[in-house]
Amino acid sequence: NTRTTDDTNERYTPEWLLKIIEDVLDGIDLDPAADPERRVNARKHYTKEDDGLDKGWSGSVFLNPPFSNSSDWVKHLCIYFHSGAVTEALVLLPVMALSNKSAALLMKNTATAFTLLGRKLSFLDREYNDIGEMSAFPFALVYCGNNTENFLSKTEEYGIGCLIRTLPTNIKSCLCSYCGKPFKAKRSTAKFCGSTCRSKSHKQSILK
């Protein structure tokens, strides 16, 4: 759910959209930007007090990032998706944000499809009542994962679906030899999740 540093700007996802998201993901493992009451039907929630940006993310994720600072949240999602910890994700973003620099990592290297929602959204307030006014701009539901056909099929009646890319099917799940975290690679013999761990491991071997 969306939250900002200004309580008056809190905007929560409408129920009809949450049902679509649950259907696409076949259940939500994590809502990393959850409202205080944890209204989203997810297995795990990170509220403002938990600070989702300070936590590891995994499984199927629904992210409706804070309006005031979506870039850090999107980047955090991309990192954990490429590591293999996040298996599927849906991100709710204003259409105008899709071309921003902060969304480049998401749209160019991570997302596999998106749907331009056919109607403007009317969010809920902190009491979960309809705020009574439509958003001033259209929104998109951005999908990250291998089940693009499922996503596009289940959202086609709510807007215009767009396929971005198909992920390689020969991707293997591996564990980083240095940090122990899971990551995806084309070779099952891959040892490190990234250049940082590779460099640290090399320095460690030199010092021994």
Labelled PLM ranges:
Residues 1-176, 207-208:
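Class I S-adenosyl-L-methionine-dependent methyltransferase catalytic core
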Residues 169-208:
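BZIP DNA-binding basic region
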